[in-house]
Amino acid sequence: MMSTMSIKEGLLVILLSLFLFDTTALIHRREIPHMESKGQMQRGQVLLGGWQERSPEDNEILELLPSVLTKVNQQSNDEYHLMPIKLLNVSSQVVAGVKYKMEVQVARSECKKSASEQVNLKTCKKLEGHPDQVMTLEVWEKPWEDFLQVNILETKVLSSV
């Protein structure tokens, strides 16, 4: 016969769960909203698993950018490789790995695509006469699996000045 949990045991389980939740947040140095806030977060609080703004100068992200552009160029039907000009905005979310939302200013380079050769975008020069673009990308990285997925969410052509 199955035994039922007493009220005291149930309360103990709830209290233990809340303690573990607060401890996990503390370990990860993240602030959590209190139960009484009824879903409203205060300035400076971070939602666990939520999106966080990142600096476009963050070395971790700058090191990832060439691989991201390689994936973008694989998806593009353009005859020329796109090259990064400037990383405009970045936010990240911890999931099974890390998801990034990036806004990257890119330009068409003088380097033509060829199935047989690997291109180093750092050596490519900007192809003049073509406007830059701002691409909004969603990037999912799981480095322990050597996994990188890039989705192009939006592309805007910048008007030439």
Swiss-Prot record:
| InterPro entries assigned | Cystatin_dom (IPR000010), Cystatin_sf (IPR046350), Prot_inh_cystat_CS (IPR018073)
Pfam families in alphabetical order: Cystatin
User: Which superkingdom?
Assistant: Eukaryota
Q: What are the alphabetically sorted keywords of the record?
A: Disulfide bond, Glycoprotein, Protease inhibitor, Signal, Thiol protease inhibitor
Could you confirm whether the keyword Disulfide bond appears in this record?
yes
Q: Per the UniProt annotation, where are the glycans attached?
A: N89
Note the SUPFAM superfamilies from the entry.
Answer: Cystatin/monellin
Q: Where is this motif: Secondary area of contact?
A: 93-97
Any single GO CC term annotated in Swiss-Prot or TrEMBL for this entry: extracellular space
Q: Does the keyword Repeat apply?
A: no
Q: Which CDD domains match?
A: CY
Instruction: Give the signal peptide as a residue range, or say none if absent.
Output: 1-25
Q: Where is this site: Reactive site?
A: G49
- The cysteines joined by S-S bonds are C111-C124
Q: Where is this motif: Important for interaction with host LGMN?
A: 76-78
Which GO-annotated molecular functions does the record name?
A: aspartic-type endopeptidase inhibitor activity; cysteine-type endopeptidase inhibitor activity
What functional role does this protein have?
Cysteine protease inhibitor which inhibits members of the peptidase C1 family. Also acts as an asparaginyl endopeptidase inhibitor. In the human host, inhibits CTSL/cathepsin L, CTSS/cathepsin S, CTSB/cathepsin B and asparaginyl endopeptidase LGMN/AEP which may cause defects in both antigen and MHC class II invariant chain CD74/Ii processing.
The UniProt family comment states: Belongs to the cystatin family.
Protein known as: Cystatin cpi-2
Organism of provenance: Brugia malayi
| Gene field | cpi-2
